Curated annotation (Swiss-Prot):
TM annotation in the entry: 27-47, 52-72, 537-557, 570-590, 608-628, 664-684, 697-717, 727-747
Uppermost EC category: transferase
Active-site annotation: D137, D459
Keyword Acyltransferase (UniProt): no
Function: Thought to be a Golgi-localized beta-glycan synthase that polymerize the backbones of noncellulosic polysaccharides (hemicelluloses) of plant cell wall.
Protein name: Cellulose synthase-like protein H1
Keywords: Cell wall biogenesis/degradation, Glycosyltransferase, Golgi apparatus, Membrane, Transferase, Transmembrane, Transmembrane helix
Molecular-function GO terms, alphabetical: cellulose synthase (UDP-forming) activity; cellulose synthase activity
Entry's Gene Ontology BP terms: cell wall organization; cellulose biosynthetic process; plant-type primary cell wall biogenesis
Topology within the bilayer: Multi-pass membrane protein
Length: 750
């Protein structure tokens, strides 16, 4: 039993959310889908396009069942950090991980602001109980230099935040606006002005730094970066701030820079490999029982976030109920009406809370607090600690480092020392050993231990492994939000991110980690399995949605119909389904405080994403499975400004769709062009029917189908006539035209 749960005052409460009306709506739409399928079967004409429609609609029905399961029983968790007051001395240590991979796509100032917000957290004895580790997979001296400068700045920034109760402790965000000063705020005004000046100096030092100069004039501090290549270098670990008692007492958390060893002969497993290296390095330096991981662009927005997390990690009667605490991804400076459909507000409130009511929310890769022993692969139940007693068993799981095996045994059996390490610099040499690129060979790292390898979405796969071991997880929603980041803007960044996620999901779906197999042979609950499938089938939706989208143009071009005509009873089923589904989606957005425009933007982006990012992800993974290609981890550019008053005239107009020469735009551009051509040809046929009395094939349903696609693909159609970054490149246009020509030829021959 957790120590905190034995107290008189509760730390958390699980609150079910009633949704009776929504359940009725779920069932009503399911009934209409089944009725449409029944109509198809009873009125089967044998036409291939109608049977294709039946197959697609059967898939949509299956997708709706998964959606209903995910939303059926939502919950929220309320936390009461004020009740931790009587247990201050019992609060455990936390190791905080920040990952960055590319100093160009993820500028050092972005990472610096995230780190500074972590160093300024409100937590008892933060200097002793918190430690911040930064993984730099780019092995950049610029990143290391920026973090060293950040540590110096933190000596004044952290006391300023605590003295004045600063709410948002990422300097770029805090200084983006000027607070209102009163007559009695003289001291605060003086401090604020000084800190703003110091931050501007920090920004200039980091932005003016260049790699050759650092290597030449760094006084030997950056000698380890000489002659290194990004994918071929030894381990570099630097203790940038060691807050031991002999020097400063209770100041701010330790700060450690880590760039793990890489070799071109060994796979480094992207972010999952970096997280596993950080886990081992931190185990030998501070070995906190809990870990927080953040992407480099997700800064702390609520300085009490660790206290809230402890309410969940310590507040249940047993540990099984909370293996990890996931916070929702929130975005600052979000564009009005969510033009790119990537703010995920409704998905969180509807699907996220629903999954939280099952075995628990998914691990989303950032903003998550973990139990270290769960990451080490510990199972639930009586057999949880078996396999950790002998040195041979520990070696097969964790590797050859005796120091690490001893630290792992301490975590698993709860034998952690309450005395802080006096000098973590003395641990650097042994820490380098476990960050070596060949350390994991012959061990369980990446499989049963640590972050799981084998998918571009290593985070979700790792969470599934934890759930499969019998653990549960919790969703932590607090005000103000725990962490904030910046959502990708423009077309390329959004679609690149979605393609990466979809590729990772499909890799899991067709692998031995498939949740159906995990439910059959392990402890993943059935409804949790369906919840995972709800996400994993994202890319599988693409061929079905593409097929259904092509049926409208095909029928208009070949004078056929695939939807019931107005004279058929099935027309009213299809019409009722169309109205019910769109009304359902609209009401979801309204209930979540979103606008009608936001609802339309999200629906539009789903159609664009399905015909672009998801489709390309589907094809990429299929080709990889057949041995024709490899999936590649693509880092999403971080677009946020990190200096006060920064204005970049090269940035695109907010909310406007931008394009590049990525192949992701080819199929969706072709589909947009095809829909317009089909409507034009269909309208011409209507004129012939009216004037010459020719028999007509397609009905109004096919026109509505194509017209709806035209509305959804309007950003692409505008891109066809746009210029610069707002115009679709000619190479994409020509390839799209070729696809359209092939489809027109197909329609003519059929």
């Amino acid at each position: 039993m957790e120590a905190a749960a034995r107290g008189n005052k509760k730390l958390q409460e699980r609150v079910p959310i009633r949704r009776t009306a929504w359940r009725l709506a779920d069932l009503a739409i399911l009934f209409l889908l089944l009725a449409l399928l029944l109509h198809r079967v009873l009125h089967d004409s044998g036409a291939p396009w109608r049977r294709a429609a039946l197959a697609c609609e059967a898939w949509f029905t299956f997708m709706w069942l998964l959606n209903v399961n995910a939303k059926w029983s939502p919950v929220r968790f309320d936390t009461f950090p004020e009740n931790l007051a009587e247990r201050i001395d019992e609060l455990p240590a936390v190791d905080m991980f920040v990952t960055t991979a590319d100093p160009v796509l993820e500028p050092p100032l972005v990472t610096v602001n995230t780190v500074l917000s972590l160093l300024a957290l409100d937590y008892p004895a933060a200097g002793e109980k918190l430690a911040c580790y930064v993984s730099d997979d780019g092995c950049s001296p610029l990143t290391c230099y920026a973090l060293r400068e950040a540590a110096r700045f933190a000596r004044t920034w952290v006391p300023f935040c605590r003295r004045h109760g600063v709410a948002v402790r990422a300097p770029f965000r805090y200084f983006s606006s000027t607070p209102e000063f009163g007559p009695a705020d003289g001291k605060f005004l003086e401090d604020w002005t000084f800190m703003k000046s110091e931050y501007e100096k920090l920004v200039h030092r980091i932005e003016d730094a260049d790699e050759p100069s650092l290597l030449r004039h760094g006084g030997g501090e950056f000698a380890e970066f000489l002659d290194v290549e990004r994918g071929n270098h030894p381990t570099i670990i630097k203790v940038l701030w060691d807050n031991n008692r002999s020097r400063t007492g209770d100041g701010f958390p330790r700060l450690i820079y880590v760039s793990r060893e890489k070799s071109p002969n060994l796979h480094h497993h992207y972010k999952a490999g970096a997280m596993n290296a950080l886990t081992r390095v931190s185990a030998l330096m501070t070995n906190a029982p809990f870990m927080l991981n953040l992407d480099c662009d997700m800064f702390v927005n609520n300085p009490r976030v660790v206290l809230h997390a402890m309410c969940l990690l310590l507040g249940f009667d047993d540990e099984i109920s909370c293996a990890f605490v996931q916070t929702p991804q929130k975005f600052y400076g979000a564009l009005k009406d969510d033009p790119f459909g990537n703010q995920l507000e409704v998905s969180l409130m509807k699907v996220g809370r629903g999954i939280a009511g099952l075995q628990g929310i998914f691990y989303c890769g950032t903003g998550c607090f973990h139990r270290r022993k769960v990451i080490y692969g510990m199972r639930t139940g009586r057999e949880g600690t078996t396999g950790y007693s002998s040195n041979k068993e520990l070696h097969s799981k964790f590797g050859s480092s005796n120091n690490f095996k001893e630290s792992a045994r301490d975590v698993i059996y709860g034998n952690l020392s309450t005395e802080p390490i006096v000098d973590i610099s003395s641990c650097v040499d042994v820490a380098k050993e476990v960050a070596a690129c060949n350390y994991e060979i012959g061990t369980c790292w990446g499989q049963e231990v640590g972050w799981v390898y084998g998918s571009l979405t290593e985070d979700v796969l790792t969470g599934q492994r934890i759930h499969a071991a019998g653990w549960r997880s919790t969703l932590m929603e607090i005000e103000p939000p725990a962490f904030m980041g910046c959502a990708p803007n423009g077309g390329p960044a959004c679609l690149t991110q979605l393609k990466r996620w979809a590729s990772g999901f499909l890799e899991i779906l067709i692998s031995r980690n498939n949740p159906i197999l995990t439910t059959t042979f392990k402890s993943l609950q059935f409804r949790q399995c369906l919840a995972y499938l709800h996400s994993y089938v994202w890319p599988v939706r693409a061929p079905f949605e593409l097929c259904y989208a092509l049926l409208g143009p095909y029928c208009l071009l070949s004078n056929q119909s695939f939807l019931p005509k107005t004279s058929e009873d099935g027309f009213y089923i299809a019409l009722a389904l169309f109205i019910a589904y769109n009304t359902y989606m609209f009401m979801e957005f309204i209930e979540c405080g979103q606008s009608a425009r936001a609802c339309w933007n999200n629906h539009r982006m789903q159609r664009i994403t399905s015909a672009s990012a998801w489709l390309l992800a589907f094809l990429t993974v299929i080709l990889k499975t057949l041995g024709f290609s490899e999936t590649v981890f693509e880092v999403t550019r971080k677009d946020k400004s990190t200096s006060d008053g920064d204005s970049n005239t090269d940035e695109p107009e907010p909310g406007r769709f931008t394009f590049d020469e990525s192949t992701v735009f080819i199929p969706v551009t072709a589909l947009a062009m095809l829909s317009v051509i089909a409507i034009a040809v269909g309208a011409w046929r209507v004129v012939l029917v009216t004037t010459e009395g020719l028999p007509g094939g397609p009905g109004i349903s096919e026109f509505i189908s194509c017209g709806w696609l035209v509305l959804c693909f309007m950003p692409l159609l505008r891109g066809l006539v746009g210029s610069g970054r707002y115009g679709i490149p000619w190479s994409i246009k020509m390839k799209a035209c070729l696809l359209v020509a092939i489809f027109l030829l197909f329609c003519k021959r059929n």
